[in-house]
């Protein structure tokens, strides 16, 4: 057993309890009533960073939730890694679908079950404990800075300004992020690309009050009916987006990419069974893995209006609402797409309702060059921990701040994540396997043993 494995084995119970201390804080950025929890979680992270060996760790205020900054400087001449993560989590609703309380972590069947077990408290803890392991074994070959934000799940609205203000403080050679997933438990991988994101809220208003559906139905437009028609028309029967100009900057999947994607082990039957669907759906001419990584998509994330309580109430509602998003591919500008969407809705909305579109958060896609020295270091580190050389894969999720880091700080990012699809992030019963938790720590420690990370 290597010294790294021995250190992890000797300290694994403490590592788990420290993670649990974070999970028990419901740091939900989407809900204002959890503002005190955001502050408490940030403070707890400073304590854990200092205990892990950071020279300093402080809570720094922003226009929104605070940022946690920490650092360990081994030498002015050494190269520097900036570790990014987030301490906020998604809301846990619907609670009735959880098999255990979301903020009371449990270990069952070799997994940690709780909100944030994977995204991203679990993966952030892998980073910090990997750093601690390398430091205590005298293996740390580079300076390490940490920046943990509290607004990733709401689009990082305060982080760009923070980065611009503290550009010198955040100076580094590469950014390391653990907030992505691997292909499967049997197939380790490194993420080489992410999709971008554009997100909107839509409000449709008809009459000035809820109306009796018998007295007014058929004579007055129903806002829910109108909203459903507007949203349904955004995609065709195959899921292709119909907004004019939407695909102008979309590059088709290249033959080389298609060949690389085809090498990824993928069992369609297992995929369908895991998510409980009989058939898959999507743009014609593309495989499932191409659709959910290299092609854009449109989704209604929430839609509501009218009477939703127990029993029946025959009303024609005054208002209807939706939250919708587009996943974008590299070269699609989220600002341009947002404008196209707003102009499209304004053009097709009927005169008998008022439609208001409010753009929310968004960001660009990102592609990591696989010839970066830091990528090679991550590849070797994962190989040591998992016993298999990781595949290079593009993923369908979004971390909009990654492209901002490159634009503002001028630093490339390496995405070394340890999640799995079955971990159910953003869903009830989120979890993380203990095996991956420890292998993630080992991978990070192995990464820090490799001094050549400068681009």
Please report, for each region that a protein language model flagged, where it lies by residue:
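N-terminal helical capping/dimerization or prosegment-like subdomains
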Residues: 2-95, 319, 336
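A generic structural motif
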Residues: 118, 208-210, 326-333, 363
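Acidic, glycine-rich active-site loops and adjacent beta-strand->loop/helix elements
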Residues: 87-89, 111, 147-156, 178-182, ...
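An extended, acidic, His-containing surface patch that forms the Zn2+-binding/catalytic region
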Residues: 51, 184-185, 242-319, 330-343, ...
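A short core secondary-structure module
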Residues: 217-238
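Flexible glycine/proline-rich, aromatic-decorated loop/lid segments
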Residues: 189-205, 414-416
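Active-site metal-coordination/substrate-binding segment of hydrolases
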Residues: 78-145, 439
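Acidic/histidine-rich catalytic neighborhood of metal-dependent amide-processing enzymes
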Residues: 118-193, 455
């Amino acid at each position: 057993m290597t010294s790294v494995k021995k250190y992890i084995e000797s300290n694994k119970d403490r590592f788990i309890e420290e993670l649990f201390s974070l999970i028990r804080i419901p740091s939900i950025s989407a809900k204002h009533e959890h503002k005190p929890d955001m502050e408490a979680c940030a403070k707890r992270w400073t304590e854990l960073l200092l205990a892990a060996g950071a020279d300093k760790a402080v809570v720094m205020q922003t226009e929104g939730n605070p940022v946690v900054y920490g650092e360990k400087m081994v030498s002015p001449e050494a190269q520097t890694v900036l570790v990014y993560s987030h301490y906020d989590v998604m809301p846990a609703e619907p609670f009735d679908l959880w098999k255990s309380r979301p903020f009371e972590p449990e270990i069952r069947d070799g997994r940690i079950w709780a909100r944030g077990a994977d995204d991203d408290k679990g993966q952030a803890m892998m980073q910090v404990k990997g750093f601690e392991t390398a430091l205590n074994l005298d293996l740390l070959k580079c300076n390490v800075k940490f920046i943990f934000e509290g607004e990733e799940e709401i689009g990082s609205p305060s982080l760009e300004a923070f980065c611009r203000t503290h550009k010198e403080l955040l100076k580094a050679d590469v950014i390391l992020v653990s907030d992505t997933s691997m292909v499967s438990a049997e197939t380790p991988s490194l993420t080489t690309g992410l999709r971008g994101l554009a997100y909107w809220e839509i409000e449709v208003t008809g009459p000035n009050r809820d109306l009796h559906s018998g007295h007014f139905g058929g004579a007055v437009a129903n806002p829910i009916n109108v909203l459903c028609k507007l949203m349904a028309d955004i995609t065709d029967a195959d899921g292709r987006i119909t907004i004019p100009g939407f695909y102008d900057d979309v590059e088709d999947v290249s033959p080389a990419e298609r060949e690389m994607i085809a090498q990824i082990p993928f069992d369609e039957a297992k995929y369908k069974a895991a998510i409980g669907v009989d058939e898959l759906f999507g743009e014609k001419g593309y495989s499932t893995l191409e659709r959910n990584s290299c092609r854009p998509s449109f989704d209604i994330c929430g839609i509501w209006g009218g009477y939703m309580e127990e029993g029946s109430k025959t009303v024609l509602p005054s208002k209807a609402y939706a939250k919708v998003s587009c996943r974008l591919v590299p070269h699609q500008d989220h600002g341009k797409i947002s404008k196209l969407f707003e102009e499209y809705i304004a053009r097709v909305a009927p005169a008998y309702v008022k439609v208001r579109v409010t753009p929310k958060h968004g960001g660009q896609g990102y592609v990591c060059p696989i010839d970066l020295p830091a990528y090679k270091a991550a590849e070797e580190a994962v190989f040591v921990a998992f016993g298999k050389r990781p595949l290079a894969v593009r993923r369908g999720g979004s971390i909009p701040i990654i492209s901002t880091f490159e634009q503002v700080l001028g630093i490339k990012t390496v995405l070394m994540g340890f999640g799995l699809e079955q971990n159910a992030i953003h869903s009830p019963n989120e979890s993380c396997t203990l095996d991956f938790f420890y292998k993630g720590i080992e991978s990070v420690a192995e990464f820090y043993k490799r001094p050549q990370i400068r681009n």
